[in-house]
Amino acid sequence: MTDSLSFAELRAHVDQHYAHQVQCLDSGRFEEYAATFTHDAEFQHTPGKEPARTRAGIIRELHTFHERFRGNPVQRRHWFNMVRLEQRVDGAYDVTFYALVITVEPGVKEPVIGPSCFVHDVLEIEGGTVRNRSRRVEHDQLL
């Protein structure tokens, strides 16, 4: 599939994948978010925690992580930018990008920005479908 795509077409597929992911994540649709990963994916986003493995593990991790917001009706928005794609020997893609998380509380005009992160993904593209094989998030404040 990717051999026949131009770079612009590949980038459009990847951008749509990430747009779908963040909208699922930000609206609490964790099962749909996890479905954007391969069945055996690895997902590491919390500093000091072991990565979640498999879609079911990703769903559990996200529910556990978001418990901290229970009773506090914040809206979180993930912003991905500066995406770089590099094809691997196995046909998958190493992707790196910057991510910002913006949190808004009801009635408060100014958002809280952070964390700022550097993200490493491995993407598989098959039959026009993009899925994460893995995601590793590095938090800038820990550098």
What role is predicted for each listed range?
Residues M1-A35:
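Short, low-complexity N-terminal intrinsically disordered segments enriched in polar/charged residues
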Residues S4, R68-L143:
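A beta-strand edge to alpha-helix "cap/lid" segment located at domain peripheries
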Residues L10, V14, D26, P51, ...:
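Aromatic-acidic/polar surface patches that form glycan- and anion
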Residues D26, T38-H39, I125:
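Residues at helix-coil transition
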Residues F30-Y98:
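A solvent-exposed, acidic/Ser-Thr-rich amphipathic alpha-helical stretch
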